[in-house]
Regions:
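Polybasic, glycine- and aromatic-enriched phosphate-binding surface used to engage nucleic acids
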Residues: 1-161
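Non-catalytic DNA-recognition/assembly elements of restriction-modification systems
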Residues: 1-19, 31-41, 154-220
Length: 220
């Protein structure tokens, strides 16, 4: 499976506003641009109740990431405790939100594979990729170079199903739909032997996982 770093229509970057160096652009007065920090990001959601900061429009004149501010993108925390069971927590970020550098973002362009922003969101939030990330990450940061190493099932026929399921989950937040997303993602990677109840990778998946990531065994 190709990794994010090898896919030219997926852009993986750090949040555009340096919370220290660009502090003068942060305002408590409402503007057209909401500031999001890492603490605002949860699994599939943005904690709107803790949003109280905005960004002055002048900031857009100095950032080289303006084009990403003006479109929907996927975001995650830049710091996540290494001991957390679920380290990868991605959410859909609407346009006109500016990200502090305590966030990472992933943008996606139109492509011939049928991979849209919702399908990619479901893949990134899967328990499988969370498991994989925990194998390759050795600190509390969610680094862009680590996200670059995540494999994406570009050629799967499940991409449209994953997208539909994610959109359904965003509307209704059904636990059953969340499990269905994980099932479809696992299937997209050619994996069918999972324990959905415990959301864990089982030993019987050893051969499948070796196919996806040959250099890593399940006993790592």
């Amino acid at each position: 499976f190709p990794k994010i770093k090898d896919i030219d229509f997926i852009i993986n970057r750090r949040g555009e506003l340096d919370l220290t160096a660009n502090k003068k652009y942060i305002s408590n007065t409402e503007t057209s641009y909401t500031l999001l920090r890492g603490r605002n990001v949860t699994l599939y959601d943005i904690r709107k109740e803790v949003i109280s900061e905005y960004v002055k429009p002048e900031f857009l004149e100095i950032t080289n990431k303006r084009q990403f501010v003006e479109k929907d993108r996927i975001i995650c925390q830049q710091i996540s405790n290494i001991n957390c069971e679920k380290r990868l927590k991605f959410a859909l970020c609407p346009s006109n939100h500016i990200l502090g550098n305590s966030c990472n973002f992933i943008a996606i362009e139109d492509n011939k594979y049928g991979l849209d922003i919702h399908a990619l969101l479901g893949i990134l939030n899967s328990n499988l990729l969370n498991w994989y990330f925990k194998l390759i990450s050795s600190n509390n940061h969610i680094n862009n170079y680590e996200l670059d190493e995540l494999p994406i099932p570009l050629f799967s026929s499940n991409l449209h199903k994953i997208s539909d399921c994610v959109q359904k989950y965003l509307l209704h937040k059904s636990p059953e739909t969340l499990l269905n997303i994980d099932y479809l993602v696992n299937e997209a990677y050619g994996i069918k032997n999972t324990d959905s109840r415990n959301k864990k990778i089982t030993n019987s998946m050893d051969n499948d996982l070796s196919y996806i990531i040959p250099s890593i065994r399940t006993n790592t």
